[in-house]
Amino acid sequence: YYDEKNLPKTAAVNVAEYIDHFEPWVRAGYEVIHINLGSSLSSAYQNCCIAAEELGQVHVIDSCSLSSGTGLLVRDAGEMIRQGMSADAIADVLRQRTEKCHASFILDTLTFLHAGGRCSSVAALGANVLKLKPCIEVNNADGSMKVGKKYRGSLDKVLVKYVKDQLAAHPDIDPSFIFITHSGIAAEYIHLVKEALKAEKDFAEIHVTTACCTISSHCGPNTLGILFETK
């Protein structure tokens, strides 16, 4: 992008691709639980539902989230599978649990959102000139995204303040697990966020993941978020 000003292109998985992916499992006698990118963010969910209706035995979950926000539900599903629950029962629980999953992230720059057509040039220029780093929050009721608090300052100070704000806003957070997810960021920032989390709450597990190429291409480097469940 820096050399040619071109971003990778992203596209939703189509119905035929979903059928090709699920059909071998269904034919083998399995029931499939598929946790999809939020329906407000992509047409992939609708395409998956069409494929599932044609195949049968595929339970499609609208995560109302993205990235490791869906990962939270995957962890929950895995635990319920280990407990021996049926696919129908697991799907029902997951659909009820989406509103307990919280996803947000800090953008270091709006340059990449602008390049992908997701914000105006005026907004991008203003944010970059003022050194604003917006917090993007995912609405866990429908998967839509909104701009939350706009932070100003160096990335290290912004990340610490962001962590404190997110945890303060969710006093009923589940302390057993939390994701730190980033699009490619220096290890020192990951360590900083880990220490900020530990200073605020005694998490049993802090798991660091890298965002997928789709998310990263829209957000750009140095994007970082924390993703967790509430009780």
Model-derived segments and spans:
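Short, contiguous strand/loop micro-motifs
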Residues: 8-9, 35, 180-181
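N-terminal glycine-rich anion-binding loop in soluble enzyme alpha/beta folds
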Residues: 1-17
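N-terminal glycine-rich phosphate/adenylate-binding segment common to multiple enzyme folds
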Residues: 15-45
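Mixed-charge interfacial surface used for oligomerization/domain docking
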Residues: 4, 30, 40-59, 65-231
